């Protein structure tokens, strides 16, 4: 790496979009953005929308949004560790929107160029519900774009919204 060149997997910002299949009639569409500034602090914002095709026709949907204030507390040339605290919201077509809190822990590893492996875990509450999400993904950085695949275990109390997903991330 030459002086001044950005190592893309650990660039100061990124945005991603992904599509996941929960089951034969439920899909997940998600987007995330992360930006980090001075002193390793950052913001991590995400939207997860689940859409279910109903047996009688039509669709039902729910949406989760989260915003974390993060700190990259450890790093080397090929690995980063982040943690954060934040806010989470839940919206559906039935009742009022609900909000709560969440905790995030994430690791990004670049074992060999161009591959990146990521793990993240977050847990929190919205109303009386406990929401947890665990993700594993692997991608390959090509210039400033990273196509990736992964698996996500998403829980809302006892409800499982697990999915396998495909996505793309853009570094800036």
Predicted features along the sequence, with ranges:
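Long, low-complexity, intrinsically disordered polar/charged segments
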Residues: 100, 111-124, 169-172
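Short glycine/proline- and aromatic-enriched beta-strand/turn motifs that initiate or cap beta-hairpins
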Residues: 1-51
């Amino acid at each position: 790496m030459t002086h001044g060149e950005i190592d893309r997997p650990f660039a100061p910002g990124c945005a991603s979009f992904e599509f996941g299949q929960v089951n034969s009639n439920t899909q997940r569409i998600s987007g995330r953005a992360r930006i980090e500034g001075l002193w390793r602090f950052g913001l991590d914002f995400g939207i997860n929308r689940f859409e279910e095709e109903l047996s009688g026709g039509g669709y039902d949907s729910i949406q989760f949004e989260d915003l974390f204030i993060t700190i990259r507390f450890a790093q080397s040339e090929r690995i980063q560790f982040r943690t954060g605290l934040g806010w989470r919201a839940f919206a559906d077509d039935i009742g009022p929107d609900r909000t709560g809190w969440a905790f995030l822990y994430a690791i990004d590893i670049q074992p060999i160029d161009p591959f990146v492996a990521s793990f993240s875990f977050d847990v929190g509450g919205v109303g009386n519900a406990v929401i947890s999400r665990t993700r594993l993904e692997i991608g390959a950085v090509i210039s400033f774009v990273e196509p990736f695949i992964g698996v996500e275990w998403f829980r809302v109390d006892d409800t499982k919204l697990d999915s396998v997903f495909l996505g793309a991330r853009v570094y800036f």
